[in-house]
Regions:
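A short, conserved alpha-helix in the catalytic core of glycosyltransferases
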Residues: 145, 156-182, 217
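Non-catalytic membrane-proximal stalk/linker segments that position and tether the catalytic domains
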Residues: 1, 6, 11-12, 58, ...
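Conserved donor NDP-sugar-binding/catalytic core segment of glycosyltransferases
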Residues: 81, 85-119
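A recurrent flexible, glycine/aromatic-enriched loop bordering the glycosyltransferase active site
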Residues: 117-145
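Cell-envelope/extracellular polymer assembly enzymes that use nucleotide-activated donors
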Residues: 1-4, 30, 165, 246-250, ...
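Short, acidic, metal-binding catalytic loop of nucleotide-sugar glycosyltransferases
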Residues: 15-28, 265-275
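Short beta-strand-to-loop acidic/aromatic patch adjacent to the donor-nucleotide binding site
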Residues: 64, 69-84
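A conserved acidic beta->alpha catalytic loop
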Residues: 33-41, 81, 282-291
Length: 305
């Protein structure tokens, strides 16, 4: 396996190398660095620098594909400090090989304000589109699938949405597998609740990012035959009658007991100078999602099963 880890501080690189060189499964260690970083730091022994512009760009993904000759690549997708377990890479590789998945991600621990907390992630579901789906920082990807992604003749170039576009591509060509084991730790830099984070897309500062995400999503929907051509639909007549609510927030869920309360509370807490409601579509969840929704009370909250 080849490792590709973002690096902003040379001490972090040295610390990672001291641990990773103990792994017999590691073929090459590459640090993703800026041109300025590379110009001011000597490359430590036992690794290489791969100069990138930003972690989420197409140039970075292409550079990763160009610099690997292993069967699998491990990409750290965030600027964070990773705590490697004794068998982190071995478990990723064993499960990737056993399942023949194009991508494997795992449960992990998070260091939040000096406290280590378990951070289980959820199973990836077919059709999932959220660009902020929590895979954790470490993605173990089949190298051939990565090469095939880069080789697509119609592949778009992105500054912000390349990791998202890669994940959507992988979901089309193979299985994205959730390894239900706590295999590593990472530092949590954003301590907001998940329900608060998911409204980042409405922040004007994220406009360019969101435009690229929407473009990648639209192209993905077209490739899986799920893109809706709205030209065939009647335009609603909003003057036909009085509507009690000006807008509705629709939240579809299935087995989301860990996050549904935060998401609904965040939606209900939005400030607006007009009336709106929140409609949660519960797709017959088999966990406590329905019970949690039943406990949430608000005049403008509707649950549909």
């Amino acid at each position: 396996i080849d490792l590709f880890l973002p690096c902003e501080y040379i001490d972090d690189a040295q610390n990672a190398l001291s641990v990773l060189h103990e792994y017999k499964t590691v073929q090459h260690i590459h640090f993703l660095v800026s041109a300025d970083f590379a110009a001011h730091h000597q490359v430590p022994e036992g690794c290489t620098f791969v100069i990138t512009d930003r972690l989420e760009s197409s140039n970075t993904i292409a550079s990763i594909a160009e610099n690997t000759d292993a069967d699998y690549v491990m990409i750290c997708t965030r600027h964070t400090t990773i705590g490697w377990g004794n068998n982190t890479l071995e478990r990723f590789l064993r499960v990737a090989d056993d399942t023949d998945a194009v991508m494997v991600y795992a449960d992990h621990y998070k260091m939040v304000e000096g406290k280590m907390e378990k951070h289980p992630v959820i199973d990836y579901q077919s059709g999932s589109l959220r660009d902020d789906f929590d895979f954790g920082s470490l993605w173990c990807i089949k190298a051939q699938a990565l090469a095939d992604y880069i080789a697509q003749p119609d592949r778009e170039e992105y500054q912000f949405a390349a990791l998202y576009d890669l994940r959507l591509y992988l979901s089309r060509v193979g299985e994205i597998f959730h390894l239900n084991e706590f295999l590593y730790s990472e530092a949590e830099l954003d301590t907001r609740k998940s329900g608060e984070k998911q409204f980042d897309y409405v922040n004007p500062r994220n406009r360019e990012v969101q435009i690229e995400m929407e473009k990648a999503c639209t192209q993905h929907l077209g490739k899986v035959g799920a893109l809706i051509d709205t030209t065939f639909y009647r335009q609603p007549d909003f003057g036909e009658q009085d509507f009690e609510y000006e807008a509705s927030v629709i939240i579809p869920v299935f087995n989301r007991e860990k996050t549904v309360a935060d998401a609904v509370k965040s939606a209900l807490g939005q400030k607006a100078n007009f009336k709106f409601n929140v409609i949660v579509v519960n797709n017959h969840s088999t966990d406590r999602t329905g019970e949690i929704l039943d406990e949430l009370k608000a005049d403008n909250l509707i649950q549909i099963v």
